[in-house]
Amino acid sequence: MMLPIKKTILASLAFIIMHWRKIIEISIIPMIFAFPLLLVLPELMAVSKQLFMVQTGVSISVPDNTLLYMLLFLFGYALLSINLARLVMLGTGSVSILSCVFEFGKIAKYTGLTMLIGFAIVFPTALTGLLFVQLIVYFLIVPLTLNFVNVAIGRALNLRWRLTFIVHVNLFLMQVLLPTLFAYLFGIVADALGLSIYVTLLVQVIIFYWSGVNLAFCYRVIVAHNSAQSL
């Protein structure tokens, strides 16, 4: 089995173009939750720069209610991610502007999985101080990201996906390397041109939408192949 990179990428982009109205609809509530954090984002970026520069004698303070804003942002992120996956897997009739807003168990499960995978990726890097370790760990656990789709559509988590090496590599390429590389290159260009942080943020949002839809398409191909193999 091969996970067709070109076809999957093009199918994801075509899906976004065809369903842009529904995508905007399911983005309204999540954007409301994310908006407070976006307002203080420039201040948070300034604080992060001060932390990296380690300026002595300079007091560092974060904006009020930052923790609350982060929690609201995380809720909106999980809500939008779930609805994107449901839109791809179950069709337009499965989502609406209020879809999953009150399904706190599902959102908590999705958030917990996000934090678990994030910790598994960041912790080894924090211990070693080597960035490439993060990529190695992410490569090893990237099949677990397919469980985000399982959570979205109400299926049980699967810890053993049994992917072939080629499929594993292609999934890592589409879900990690390509989005990261594109965001990194655009960040360099944005800094060189002096573009606003909100322009960079807009590109990050576009990458998020594409990655979410692309993950669901990868899931469909992998699950369909595994089901055919089990017959």
Spans of model-derived segments:
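Short, small/hydrophobic-residue-rich motifs at membrane-helix boundaries and re-entrant hairpins
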Residues: 22-90
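Charge-rich, low-complexity terminal tails
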Residues: 2, 47, 166, 215, ...
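Short alpha-helical linear motifs
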Residues: 34, 49-53, 183-187, 198-199, ...
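Juxtamembrane "helix-exit" motif on the non-cytosolic side of transmembrane helices
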Residues: 43-51, 122-129, 185-195
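Selective recognition of hydrophobic, aromatic-rich stretches within alpha-helical transmembrane segments
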Residues: 60-92, 122-155, 194-226
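Interfacial aromatic "cap" segments that immediately flank transmembrane helices
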Residues: 2-36, 98-121, 139-187, 231
